[in-house]
């Protein structure tokens, strides 16, 4: 299995620290607002990575944090005149509701909150201070980037260029403009703060992830992941402070997903071109979002549009139709001792795609090729052994991709029947254009209509 390591800028064979065990840390949300579809990409991508490791027999320790203390949270609490913990509680629950719809494996996820690790953060900063890598200025503690070995090695940024390109820093407390806050002193009495050797204050954002990953996964972790926008300065600063503190290599593999675009521009709150999952969910099941996010390789940008989601929904319907067809013919299949070696070939192609840096786009193509093969070659006369092998492969691929997890798909049949009724009504009204459009929509879902003397019947296409 090869993964593209941002640190080395090449695909590398994955070698875990401990055989058949893997620790993964994914930077989670700052919980001050609802998550948008751009926030969903790392959730889906790295959950799929976790699922594939499990498929391959690994024990996985998966950590995704909540940043529950931050300037944005403090400002929102101030604006709404409520305690900051009410803000974080509300948006953590909203996040959990959304990721449940995305079929994120919540049960096997560790969700540390920054405020639960304050003591560990203070010890971490004290260690850096004792090593001469951090300095205190009137209650604010900064990391001195000149003390970090190879600063810029992840983002490939040169420290001298960074200094030259840095804006004139209004904070004259810093020794270098690129130094960053490890501990921030409280600005006013109403701000949340904790006691420390440097006075009342709170941790800096970069510090939080370093300490939580160290405490839960150890000084060196297998995989650190997140969106590519976190490469610099967040992940770069994590490396600097962690490796200076522990003297150990921080993470062996760095994985970064690319951005979501809208009309080829990055989706972001600052550009006001973002779409909240809770709003998208009013029209589309979040399983559609999951399949769409996996339809493009995670290191490539993916463009968001309503038309794309409609097409993805139709694709998902086709998959559910194939799943139901396979289950139905399995119930009536014959007990013959037969095998189909093509199933093994499809499995090998799926694994080949996933072993190549989690190429979910190719893996999905394999799945669609497989259901075409099922529709064309299998029926009630097919051996039960063959159909069980086919079902096992479909279930395994579905598990890894995190799709087709709904057992009751009566809703799909109801939708098909409703569309057929709409088509019948359109034909009675001689609105043949609308009737053809409905027929084409059903065809895109893998449903073929046949007009008979007894009425319209439908079946799955090949």
From Swiss-Prot:
Keywords: Aminoacyl-tRNA synthetase, ATP-binding, Cytoplasm, Ligase, Metal-binding, Nucleotide-binding, Protein biosynthesis, Zinc. Its EC number is 6.1.1.16. Binds 1 zinc ion per subunit. The keyword Nucleotide-binding applies. Its cofactor is Zn(2+). One of its GO terms (biological process) is cysteinyl-tRNA aminoacylation. Pfam families: CysS_C, DALR_2, tRNA-synt_1e. GO terms for cellular component: cytosol. ATP binds at residue 269. It is found in: Cytoplasm. InterPro entries: Cys-tRNA-ligase, Cys-tRNA-synt_Ia_DALR, Cys-tRNA/MSH_ligase, CysS_C, Rossmann-like_a/b/a_fold, tRNA-synt_1_cat_dom, tRNAsynth_Ia_anticodon-bd. Zn(2+) binds at residues 27, 209, 234, 238. GO terms for molecular function: ATP binding; cysteine-tRNA ligase activity; zinc ion binding. A motif ('HIGH' region) lies at residues 29-39. It is an enzyme of class 6 (ligase). Monomer. Belongs to the class-I aminoacyl-tRNA synthetase family. HAMAP family: Cys_tRNA_synth. This is Cysteine--tRNA ligase. It comes from Finegoldia magna (strain ATCC 29328 / DSM 20472 / WAL 2508).
């Amino acid at each position: 299995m090869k993964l593209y390591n941002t640190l080395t800028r090449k695909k590398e064979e994955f070698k875990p620290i401990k055989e058949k065990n893997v620790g993964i840390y994914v930077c989670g949300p700052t919980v001050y607002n609802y998550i948008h579809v751009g926030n969903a990409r790392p959730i889906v991508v790295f959950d799929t990575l976790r699922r594939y490791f499990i498929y391959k027999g690994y024990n996985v320790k998966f950590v995704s944090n909540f940043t529950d203390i931050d300037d944005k949270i403090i400002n929102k609490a101030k604006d709404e005149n409520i305690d900051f913990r009410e803000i974080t509680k509300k948006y953590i629950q909203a996040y959990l509701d959304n990721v449940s719809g995305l079929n994120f494996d919540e049960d096997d996820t560790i969700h540390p909150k920054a405020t639960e690790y304050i003591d560990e953060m203070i010890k971490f900063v004290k260690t850096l201070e004792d090593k001469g890598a951090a300095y205190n200025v009137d209650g604010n503690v900064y990391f001195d980037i000149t003390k970090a070995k190879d600063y810029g090695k992840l983002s490939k940024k040169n420290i001298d260029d960074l200094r030259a390109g840095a804006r004139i820093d209004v904070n004259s407390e810093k020794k270098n403009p690129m130094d960053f806050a490890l501990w921030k002193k409280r600005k006013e009495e109403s701000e949340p703060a904790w006691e420390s050797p440097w006075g009342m204050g709170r941790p800096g954002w970069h510090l939080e992830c370093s300490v939580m990953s160290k405490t839960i996964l150890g000084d060196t972790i297998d995989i650190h992941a997140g969106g590519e926008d976190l490469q610099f300065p967040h992940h770069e600063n994590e490396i600097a402070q962690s490796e200076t503190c522990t003297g150990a290599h921080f993470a062996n593999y760095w994985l970064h997903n690319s951005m979501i675009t809208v009309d080829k521009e990055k989706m972001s709150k600052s550009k006001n071109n973002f779409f909240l999952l809770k709003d998208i969910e009013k029209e589309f099941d979040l399983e559609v979002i999951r399949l769409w996010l996996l339809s493009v390789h995670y290191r490539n940008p993916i463009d968001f549009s309503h038309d794309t989601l409609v097409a993805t929904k139709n694709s998902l319907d086709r998959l559910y139709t194939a799943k139901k067809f396979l289950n139905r013919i399995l119930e009536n299949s014959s007990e013959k001792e037969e095998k189909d070696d093509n199933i093994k070939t499809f499995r090998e192609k799926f694994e080949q795609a996933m072993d190549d840096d989690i190429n979910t786009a190719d893996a999905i193509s394999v799945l669609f090729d497989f259901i075409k093969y099922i529709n064309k070659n299998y029926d009630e006369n097919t051996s039960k052994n063959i159909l069980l092998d086919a079902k096992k492969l479909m279930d395994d691929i579905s598990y890894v991709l995190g799709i087709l997890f709904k057992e009751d798909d009566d809703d799909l049949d109801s939708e098909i029947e409703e569309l057929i009724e709409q088509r019948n009504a359109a034909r009675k009204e001689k609105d043949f254009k609308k009737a053809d459009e409905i027929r084409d929509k059903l065809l895109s879902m893998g449903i073929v209509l046949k007009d008979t003397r007894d009425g319209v019947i439908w079946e799955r296409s090949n």
